[in-house]
């Protein structure tokens, strides 16, 4: 552009997301064109509200500043004697430096109220500007009046046909008695007095010039968001001419009754309305499950196809969903972004934090419909419900045994693999289950944290305490379905049922003899190994069965077991 400006030199670095906070005085940058009529920058300024400004992208905001600068330059160029003149505006006393013509800078006594405009800040007592940033700062009120009124010159970019003879100028402008050489020149000159706004909108009665850049604000009435649709051939919503603008006013728009959101096409209403009416139009071809949104169906179908498109670059593990990969990567990075506000414990996954916080709140939102027992975690309820249904979905591929829980299957499989990942630091004994190690360590520590409230006896294990308490209560919850006999322990019922089935699962590898009970099998094996772990303190003799040791003191005392 030919002229530098109060904004033009400093806006193209990076258009800001926040609209500039500037308000023009009523007579700001007013140019006296023919000693009579004033053309002000306000006549040609394009105003945006905050909401409209946010819809513009960086390219559109740059274009906005270009249009503003061009309009301002056009006003200045109307009365210059030379097109090569240089004008420079700066903040302070020397506001305008000009060569070739005389200019006067004056303070405006009146501020305009441009409601809804992006130029909002009061100009009074504002004179500072940050020339380094993209935002427009505050400028002094000023009015530029031309003392020299040279002959009329058109805009630099406008090329008009010239007539060589003065007699060939039939077009006369009555107000100034100026004669022009052609109708185009005459029309363009008339726009000086009308602000260059020959096109009027029949919806809002706003006027526009032929410059298509002025159409930036035409989306105000329709709610069309700039740079979102490409129906009009050129870039986004910068419409070519006034006819396109009129078309928008006449175009039918479709509104979602529930959400009060407006759409340009009826096809765009349907997906949003499905959210309100609960319709599920997208059905999975594998399992028949339906979804309201197609993206949800696509995500779901990865379960059936076993498609895993997201790979961890650290360990190569694949995942179906990006969120799963993100959570997994925190294992490698050690990141735990979710912190408990009660105990400051941290977690990798937000769902873990939510479940943990229920320990502090006591919330148990998942209740069993069969027995009413409540749980703080959904998966605990799922495991519990299998007690009522008898469902055991996890099967051991080695022996065919089935389990209700995946963790039980994992522990069982270690019997076949011999894996014992949990090792005691005191005696280096290894265990296949972590809870077994915890119980074992209490042998070394002597800890017995579980106390019977009836007799005060302590136990290392909760299961031992529960079994003991049944002695006081007489409870025998495990009943044989064949003969009706009841037992305090589930293991006792299991061994009893083998009497009816004839099952003897414990077989001696040395002689092939089979046993119903593991204790009987252990005693028998000591015959082959000659193991005698029970020693008499009186005589030093050892025995393979503890019962023989119990009878030994009677030999020394002469006590008779039977009368």
Curated annotation (Swiss-Prot):
Q: Name one GO cellular component term.
A: nucleus
Query: What are the recorded Gene Ontology BP terms?
Result: regulation of transcription by RNA polymerase II
Question: Where, subcellularly, is it found?
Answer: Nucleus
Does this entry carry the keyword Nucleus? yes
Cite the location of the cross-link Glycyl lysine isopeptide (Lys-Gly) (interchain with G-Cter in SUMO2) from the record. Answer: 87, 268
Note the InterPro entries from the entry. Answer: KRAB, KRAB_dom_sf, Znf_C2H2_sf, Znf_C2H2_type
Keywords noted in UniProt = DNA-binding, Isopeptide bond, Metal-binding, Nucleus, Repeat, Transcription, Transcription regulation, Ubl conjugation, Zinc, Zinc-finger
Residues forming the KRAB domain are: 39-119
Q: Which domain of life is it from?
A: Eukaryota
Q: Molecular function terms in GO for this entry?
A: DNA-binding transcription factor activity, RNA polymerase II-specific; RNA polymerase II transcription regulatory region sequence-specific DNA binding; zinc ion binding
Which residue spans match zinc fingers labelled C2H2-type? 199-221, 254-276, 282-304, 310-332, 338-360, 366-388, 394-416, 422-444, 450-472, 478-500, 506-528, 534-556
Q: Which SMART domains match?
A: KRAB, ZnF_C2H2
User: Major location, coarse class?
Assistant: nucleus
Give the matching Pfam families: KRAB, zf-C2H2
Regarding protein family, the annotation reads:
Belongs to the krueppel C2H2-type zinc-finger protein family.
Per its database record, what is this protein's job?
Answer: May be involved in transcriptional regulation.
- Specify the protein name: Zinc finger protein 529
Protein's organism? Homo sapiens (Human)
Provide the taxonomic classification: Eukaryota, Metazoa, Chordata, Craniata, Vertebrata
């Amino acid at each position: 552009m030919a002229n530098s400006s109060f904004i033009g030199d400093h806006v193209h670095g990076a258009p800001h997301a926040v609209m500039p906070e500037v308000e023009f005085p009523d007579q700001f940058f007013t140019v006296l064109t023919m000693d009579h009529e004033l053309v002000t920058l306000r006549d040609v300024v394009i105003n945006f509200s905050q909401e409209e400004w946010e819809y513009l992208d960086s390219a559109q905001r740059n274009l906005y500043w270009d249009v503003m600068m061009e309009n301002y330059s056009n006003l200045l160029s109307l009365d210059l004697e030379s097109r090569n003149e240089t004008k420079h505006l700066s903040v302070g006393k020397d506001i305008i430096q000009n060569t070739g013509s005389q200019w006067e800078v004056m303070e405006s006594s009146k501020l305009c109220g441009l409601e809804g405009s992006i130029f909002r800040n009061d100009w009074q007592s504002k004179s500072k500007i940050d020339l380094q940033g993209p935002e427009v700062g505050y400028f002094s009120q000023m009015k530029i009046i031309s003392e020299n009124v040279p002959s009329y010159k058109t805009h630099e970019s406008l090329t008009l046909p010239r007539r060589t003879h003065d007699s060939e100028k039939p077009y006369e402008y009555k107000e100034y008695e100026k004669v022009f050489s052609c109708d185009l020149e005459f029309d363009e000159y008339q726009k000086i007095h009308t602000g260059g706004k020959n096109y009027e909108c029949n919806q809002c009665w706003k006027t526009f010039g032929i410059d298509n850049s002025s159409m930036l604000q035409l989306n105000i009435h329709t709610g069309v968001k700039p740079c979102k649709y490409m129906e009009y051939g050129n870039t986004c919503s910068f419409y070519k001419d006034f006819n396109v603008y009129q078309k928008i006013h006449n175009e039918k728009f479709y509104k979602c009754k529930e959400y009060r959101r407006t759409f340009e096409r009826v096809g765009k209403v349907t997906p949003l309305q499905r959210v309100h009416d609960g319709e599920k139009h997208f059905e999975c071809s594998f399992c028949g499950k339906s979804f309201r949104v197609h993206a949800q169906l696509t995500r779901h179908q990865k379960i059936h196809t076993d498609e895993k498109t997201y790979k961890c670059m650290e360990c190569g593990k694949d995942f179906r969903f990006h969120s799963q990969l993100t959570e997994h990567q925190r294992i490698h990075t050690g990141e735990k972004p979710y912190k408990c506000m009660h105990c400051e414990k941290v977690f990798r996954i937000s769902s873990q934090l939510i479940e943990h916080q229920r320990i502090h709140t006591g919330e148990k939102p998942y209740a069993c419909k069969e027995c009413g027992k409540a749980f703080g975690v959904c998966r605990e309820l799922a495991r519990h419900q299998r007690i009522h249904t008898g469902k055991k979905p996890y099967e051991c591929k080695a022996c065919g045994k089935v389990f209700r829980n995946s963790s039980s299957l994992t522990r069982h499989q270690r019997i076949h693999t011999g894996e014992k990942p949990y090792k005691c630091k005191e005696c280096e004994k290894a265990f296949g289950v972590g809870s077994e190690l915890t119980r074992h360590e209490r042998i070394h520590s002597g800890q017995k944290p579980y106390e019977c409230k009836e007799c005060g006896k302590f136990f290392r294990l909760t299961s031992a305490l529960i079994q003991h308490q049944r002695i006081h209560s007489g409870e025998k919850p495990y009943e044989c379905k064949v003969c009706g006999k009841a037992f305090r322990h589930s293991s006792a019922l299991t061994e009893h049922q083998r009497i009816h089935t004839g099952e003897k699962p414990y077989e001696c590898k040395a002689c092939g003899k089979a046993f119903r009970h593991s204790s009987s099998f252990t005693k028998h094996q000591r015959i082959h190994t000659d193991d005698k772990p029970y020693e008499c303190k009186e005589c030093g003799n050892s025995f393979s069965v503890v019962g023989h040791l119990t009878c030994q003191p009677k030999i020394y005392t002469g006590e008779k077991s039977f009368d």
